[in-house]
Structure formats: C-alpha cells, structure tokens
Amino acid sequence: MPQIIQLQNATIGYPDKVVLDHLDWEIQRGEHWAITGPNGCGKTTLMRTLLRLIPLRSGELRCYDVEGKLTEGLVTSYLPQISQIDRHFPIHVYEVIDSGLPDALKPAKERWEQVQHLAEATGISHLLGQPIGRLSGGQLQRTLLARALASDPELLILDEPLSFLDRSYKESFEELLSTIVRPETTILMVTHDLQAGDQEHWQVLSLGHF
C-alpha cells in the first residue's frame, strides 16, 4: 500500500508548550496503528495535529492521495471518547448516523437507506429510533462508529474507543472493526487497552518512551 501520511522532524504542541519533538512517522494506506503511552504524553495532541485542528510548531506534515500525490485534504473521520458525549442532548440514533453522511443534498429516501445500511453493519438497526440517552456504552460506541464510517473515510481516528466498555463489548468492537472497515482504510487508535495478543494486528507507536 502507498504512503498516506508522513511526519518529518515534527515538533508538536501549543504556543506555550512543546508536547512532542523531533517526531518521524510514516503511515501507509490500510495500516492499523495503536498509539499508546501514559496520560499527558501527547496522544491526543498528536491526533489533533493530524486532524489539522492545531498547527505544527515545526517540521513537515505531508498527506498523500491514492496516487501518491501530495494533497491538502484526506477524507477523515474521528470517533471521540464516549465520555465526551452529552447523553442528555435530544438526538436519536438515526440522526447521529445521518449527520455523518457527506452529501446533505441527497434525497431523504437515499439518506435513510444509507443510515439503515450502516446501522445493520454495526448491529444497531433495532436502536435507530432510540435517543442516545437510553443507550449502553457499547451501543453508543457502535452508533458513533456508524457515523464515522458514513463518509467512507480514508483515515479513521479512534480516541480511546475501548474505554468504559466491559470485556465482551471490547472484544465485539474489535471484531466489528475487522469486519466492516474497508481493508484500504487507515486506522489510528489511541488506546490504553491494547492487549499483548492484539499487537500482531496493530503496529504500535508508543509515546513517552523515546
């Protein structure tokens, strides 16, 4: 698979604080990376930089399209930590998924069919009419994953997707990723929960241990 992202001699952080320095990292299309490390080591700051929410302090961040040419924008989806979601917000599962669809001008019938397809793929068809406040942690995570996949992303960034989930949901979520995410989709997962047996499926970038 060709390269999708390259960080070269990158300094990452904020105007008053350097979080990561002299970072070199190359990511190929279709690779699955687990970003690990202690709290405060820069995992979230790195993801925010890749999402271009904060600028590089110095160095180079290059993104490449499917033909290997430099591009300013990748089709990227972000799955936040479920602890960041306001469960009291009055929105239903089908509305959450629909909000991830890229073309707001599509006919309502076509959008609904896409929502149903994504809900079926993530095993939440029976929950489409439920408000998010009634969902379990695992059900909410699947809802957010369906939304993230709605744009058919080239790059999928998962921020602590296994936190606050019990063991059975963790296993089912990992299995879900392997079955419904396209092989050519690149996945970056911030996690504290990577088990030794999972490391054969994930390349690991360990921060705070340079």
Language-model segment annotations:
Residues 51:
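Helix-to-loop junction immediately C-terminal to a conserved catalytic motif
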Residues 152:
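Conserved catalytic motifs of ABC-family nucleotide-binding domains
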Residues 145:
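Hydrophobic anchor residue at the start of the ABC signature
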Residues 110-127:
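Conserved ABC ATPase "signature" region
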Residues 131-135:
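Conserved ABC ATPase signature
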Residues 191-192:
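H-loop/switch region of ABC-family ATPase nucleotide-binding domains
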Residues 156-160:
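Catalytic Walker B motif of ABC-type/P-loop ATPase nucleotide-binding domains
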